[in-house]
Structure formats: structure tokens, C-alpha cells
């Protein structure tokens, strides 16, 4: 019986990803980093590769935010992403 729940979560995640693209208010940078890191963790798993260096401040911030989620399951990342988008759309 776990399979339908997983499919439902995936559908909710995909709907949230579409809703995030259509928000009327631009989120602040901290919220954008949370959305990015949860999305990447949900879709790709733990961060890999070297941290961007030099003057790539945005790349470094994205890498760091994603790296903080190391070990989080895809399901937990999807759930957190959905909650973050819901919160954003309520504002």
C-alpha cells in the first residue's frame, strides 16, 4: 500500500514545483535557497562535486544550502518543498 502514497507525494511535489514558478510575489533569497536545496535533494539526492569557489557567490550559497540537507530522504525533501511553496503562496 505504500506505492500509492509515494505516487501522490510525487504528484504533489510536481504541482508545487509548477506553483512555485507562478508565485506573484518574488521570494527573498533565503526562501529561494530553501526551495532550491529541497528541490535538488528531492530530485538528485546528496550534493556531489566540488563547491564553487572564487567569485561565484551565488553558486557557493546554492551548494552550501544543498549540502546542509545531506542524508535527507527524497520523500522528506519533497514534503519540505511542498510546505515551503504552500507557505510562500499564503503570503
Write out the residue ranges for each language-model feature.
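A charge-rich, low-complexity, intrinsically flexible signal that marks solvent-exposed coils, linkers
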Residues: 2-54, 59-91
